[in-house]
Structures are given as structure tokens and as C-alpha cells.
């Protein structure tokens, strides 16, 4: 008993604060395996438009839809396809919005994205995206984990596992959201990877996580002693039980302590010059998408590897063209996203930061009419997995490129299809990782983000 007490006191006296988190994790075989080759990017900012933006209203103009307005799609296109709600004989629905070409690249944007359109020569637009899932929960899981069911690690968790942290005082993987999402915490979970690699959910107010401030009467020195004592007990338990999740618990206590110092400074967006706040449209503490985008830049500056922002409001089954539907979603998104790209570029961070703007899928070129009057009075669009668009910026991608072509209706790729697995493989490549070698042994087999699929789309690279 006395021997155990002495061991505990020695462990507590040493203090976890003197031990690098990276060393702790490496001892548990859950730390970074280092890049496989020279990376072009160090960070990813993943902007997830929850619900699925309509590609034919934003990025992929289809004049043929006007010629076929109200007429069913050809059987040759619809055969074997899956939809969430819309019947297969639904008529084509043309976009009411004007499209134009922008920049030297001549990239097409609709009038709903005027700010992003002005940055056309800094952006890569992929029009030929495909996914396997057409419902929100499974679709969210697929875009984040490469698998449509629960239990797999998310993209950010794989990046954390593969590359480790760039900061000793902030998490490697941070998540911010405008509201609940269909797949819940599984959209940033670590799955079967060690729990230390899961995303940390931040709020965009003054206190990013609950209970960040010490209770009244507890100063930082006292808190350090408590953390060291608890960590010493956990380390003894780790030696006895050899449970890797105990290392996660130790690391989380230590990160929480360090966040007490780094978190408040990170969240003080009011310290930004007024012209920066104005560019984003951000107001300190308002919890808006604009503030999240500004915080994403501040996080990247301070070494956060993977920032995931989730913006609700893109699931328009009916009333898609109401002022408070697609137009409103674009107004909330367009200016802050553009400001983020400008800000990263001006600070020399865009070259090392890959920005991904996407939904979990797109919307059908056909109308979803809830009522007989729906087609003419209040049309919507259903979920669509077979062809949608996304935007990339920075991180070694080719600016000014429009990649992939869909058919005349915007239904599915006619040239250069890009699957979600290909997106993951390409993003990992830009981070210096070979997606076929980034593996984790679980239940007798090696798993990876891209499963047994995926290819690096070299045409997207600068």
C-alpha cells in the first residue's frame, strides 16, 4: 500500500504539464504516423451546408431544364435511380436565377452567390460529385466518414490520427454548428480510433466549451494540482489495465486545462479590426456562421488542423425559391465564406489551408411538388446523390478550374465523375498522406477513410 502511495506521489509531483501530449499519445500507439510525402496543405476547413444545396440553382447552369419544364426526365436517365420523396415521373424544374461567367477563368455562378463569384479565380468548382447515400443521416455520415452507417471515424479524426497536432493548447479537430444535424455527434466522432481524435464541439460565444472557467475560489495553480493528481491516478490505472482510452482521458483533462488559458483569447473576435468584422459580417458573440468563419481563420492561425463548420438551412423540399429559403441560405453563407477565403489569402494561409464547401448531396433537377399547385406556386427539389457540385479553395488545388460535366439536365456526370471517396483521397494527398496507407487495425482488418475505394484526382491539383 505504501509503495503504491509513493508511486502516486511521484507521478503527481512530476505533473502532466511537464509531459508533451504528443509523447503521451505516442506511448499508446495512437499518435501521428507522419506524412508519407511532402504536404501542400497543413489545415482543412470543411464547410458543410447541411441539407444539400441545389447545384442547378447555384453552380451548374442547365438551360435544357427550361426547354423541358414540367416534362418527365427520359427513362434512360432515371432507370435504376433512387430518390427520397419525388416520383420518377416528376417534371423538370428550371432555375429562375440568372447565371454569368466571372473572372479570367470564366467560372459560372448564379446571382445568389455574388461574393463567391467575385473570387472565381481563387476557387475550384467540381460539378461532377457523387455519393452513395440520398438521406440526410446516412449522407452526412458518408461525406464525413466514407461510410453510410454508424461506427466509422470521421475525416477530421483520420487527419488527427495521421498527422497529430500543431498546437499544444488547442484541439487538433474542432467543430462548430449552427444547430442540430441528422447524424448527431457521429459527424465528428472518432469511431474505432482512440477517442482523443474525436472532434471537440465549440460554441461561438465567449465560452467555447462548458465549464471553461474555474469555480469561484479555485485559482489556476490549484486547478493545476487537481489535474496533476487526477492524471497521476489515471496513469496508474493505465499501467494496470492497459486500456488506451485511459490515455485519452488523461489527454482530455490536460487539453481542458490548457483551453482555460487559450480558449478565451481565441474567442475574442472583438479584438479583430473593425474592417475585418465588417468583411465577414460578424458580431462578437452572436453565434452566426459569419463568426464561425472568422473563428475558423483564428483557429488555423493558432494551429488547429481541422475545422468543421456545419450550416443548416439547405433542405428545400418545397418553397425553395421563397425569400426565406434558398435566397436566405445563400445570403447567410456567401459573404462570410468569401471573406474567409480573402482573409486566409491576405495572411498567407490559403496556400496551406484547404477549404472545402459542400453539402452531403445535391438536389434533383426535377420538381418536388407537395400539392397539385406546388409546381407553379411553391416548388421544391428532392435529395440527389448522383450529381452535385462543390467548391475547393487553397491547399494546393488549381484555382480558376471548373472540373467535371453533368448531362444536359444536371442529373449525373457525363465527364470526369468524382466520388466522395475520391474527394477524401485527394484531400489526404494534399496533406501529405497516401489514403491507401493511412490505416487502423480494428477487429482483424485494416480500415481506412476511403475503405477499398478512392483515387487522387490529379487534375484538381495545382
What feature does the model see in each segment?
Residues 1-462:
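Ligand-binding pockets and gating/stacking loops
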